[in-house]
Amino acid sequence: MIFLINIKLSLIIINQNLHGKMIVYKNLNIKKKHKGSVVAIGNFDGLHVGHKKVLKEAKLKAKKNNLKFGLITFEPAPTMFFNKSIKNHRINSLEQKIYFLKKMKLDFLIIINFNKNFSNLSAEEFIRKILFNKLRTKYIYVSRNFKFGKKRLGDIITLKNFEKKYFYKMVIISPHKKKKKIVSSSLIRKIIRQGQLNKVKKLLGRTWSIEGVVVKGDQRGRKIGFPTCNIKLNSYTVPKLGVYSVWVQIDNLKKRGIANIGYRPTFSGKSLLLEVNIFGIKKNLYKKILNISFIKFIRAEKKFKNINQLKDQIKKDIVKAKNNV
């Protein structure tokens, strides 16, 4: 039984009731109780340890001043909006980002639809129209390399220059470093592509994972005795091609598994897929949402001379995966 998981990113459309006490805004109709707050700003893809440092500092400031605390983020990411050729860029989906932010107990999250009109706002227009008019922001937390406004002309100097005019205080959070390297989403994407999952885990503060909805596939894995879930990676960052040990979350059930990322050269495949064999699962998972956590890289992708060679190798991979997870 083979399934095809087609990852559908939840762009802007959020069910607020699914995210506990954190209010998710998909527009700028901000409730009065969230005005005059402490606000962090950024894309926060992956929500890594550096992002968490910014959010923890901002949350502490809010607590000391008896204020609400929230985050302004953008969908899609400005990088993906301006460069349509970038297809595999996300560390996490929007829904995953919301889930992780909820665990950090933010009061609110504002998801700004990054479109042509928004991209044409000058730096001061962004400050005046959003941070001042809509939010009456008291404190703004950003990283040292923060850029904003049309053509990315706004930066921390711009924010500093407008503090008195728009009645806020800017706070800069220094970069978080691991082994003398600045932790960034770009660095994490690079390490994911290299298949160095232990390093990724340290920088994220958790295991890297993707989510997808199960749909029907071509049943090729079933025919050779290894039913798989096939995933089109869509906008997710593509890991190093090859075989991985994984954990798979299905509702409240967590199972071990093995995954292959590549083009299926033995079958002359053309499209990039992530195929996952879930240990001990035989039931129909059609339309189920799966969360797949990558544990360890096992081996590189390989073209086999025949199906029997492939089957023998899969058996060996499964043994290694069970020992690694």
Regions found by a protein language model. Give the residues of each.
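N-terminal amphipathic/basic-hydrophobic helices that include classical n-h-c signal peptides
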Residues: 1-21
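N-terminal catalytic cores of NTP/NDP-binding nucleotidyl/phosphoryl-transfer enzymes
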Residues: 29-87, 93
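Phosphate/ribose-recognition catalytic cores of enzymes acting on nucleotide-derived substrates
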Residues: 215-325
